[in-house]
C-alpha cells in the first residue's frame, strides 16, 4: 500500500526488485 513513486502505465515497475507491484497504474509496496 505504500507508493513507490513509479507508474506502470507503459512499462512495468522497475521497483519490483524491492517488492513493489503494479496497482491502478501505479507501483505500490504493501
From Swiss-Prot:
Q: Family per UniProt?
A: Belongs to the cyclotide family. Bracelet subfamily.
What InterPro entries does this protein map onto? Answer: Cyclotide, Cyclotide_bracelet_CS, Cyclotide_sf
Organism ancestry: Eukaryota, Viridiplantae, Streptophyta, Embryophyta, Tracheophyta
* Chief subcellular location: secreted
* Cross-link Cyclopeptide (Gly-Asn): where in chain: 1-30
What is the protein's known function?
Probably participates in a plant defense mechanism.
Q: Print the domain comment field.
A: The presence of a 'disulfide through disulfide knot' structurally defines this protein as a knottin.
- Which keywords does UniProt give here? Disulfide bond, Knottin, Oxidation, Plant defense, Secreted
Protein name per Swiss-Prot or TrEMBL: Cyclotide cter-Q
GO BP term, example = defense response
Which cysteine residues pair off into disulfide bonds?
A: 4-20, 8-22, 13-27
Q: What processing steps or modifications follow its translation?
A: This is a cyclic peptide.
Q: Which SUPFAM superfamilies match?
A: Cyclotides (SSF57038)
Q: According to its record, what are the GO cellular component terms?
A: extracellular region
Q: Where is the signal peptide?
A: none
Question: Where in the cell?
Answer: Secreted
Q: Which Pfam families match?
A: Cyclotide
Q: Does the keyword Disulfide bond apply?
A: yes
Amino acid at each position: 500500500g505504500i507508493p513507490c513513486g513509479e507508474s506502470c502505465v507503459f512499462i512495468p515497475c522497475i521497483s519490483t526488485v524491492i517488492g513493489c507491484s503494479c496497482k491502478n497504474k501505479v507501483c505500490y509496496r504493501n
